[in-house]
Amino acid sequence: SLLIPSHNDTAVALAEHVSGSVPKFVKLMNKKAAVLGCKNTHFATPNGLDAGMDHYTTARDLAKIACYAWKKPMIRKIVKRQQGTITSLNGNTYTFRTTNKLLGNMDRVYGIKTGYTRKAGHCFVGMIQAGNGKTYISVTLGGPTSDARWADTRRLLQYADTLK
């Protein structure tokens, strides 16, 4: 539920499960970002929700993180799905749908992550497996509306699909 509908509470739960606490997980996130060459990124939360001036990134750094994530088969499998179902420990079943408006509406386009806060605006990191066989990542940040985010992303990915 973290990558398909973008549930922020799932990010916190995963952080606590993996590292025992959110601060410890955020420290790991920042270490990994540095290893990936993200020079203009500092995380303060595992879910991207505004956390003051200590939480920031750039489109370039998000693209680096997306390229790394795309190499993981499980990530590729998840972000290609339009919906998912999970069963809780007490047996309740929950179905959720993607927040990626392009998934299923634009050929060879897959999601990676949607986001929105008042500070960041409407954001999306997506990708296309272009006709030339290459994979291109797009990052849109600061969209004034959700529709603007999708229009900008569509234009970027359509352009990438024309590259030779």
Give the ranges of each region predicted by the language model:
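Penicillin-recognizing serine hydrolase domain
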Residues: 21-164
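Signal peptide-directed extracytoplasmic domains
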Residues: 1-4, 27
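Substrate-binding clefts and substrate-entry loops adjacent to catalytic sites
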Residues: 4-16, 42-44
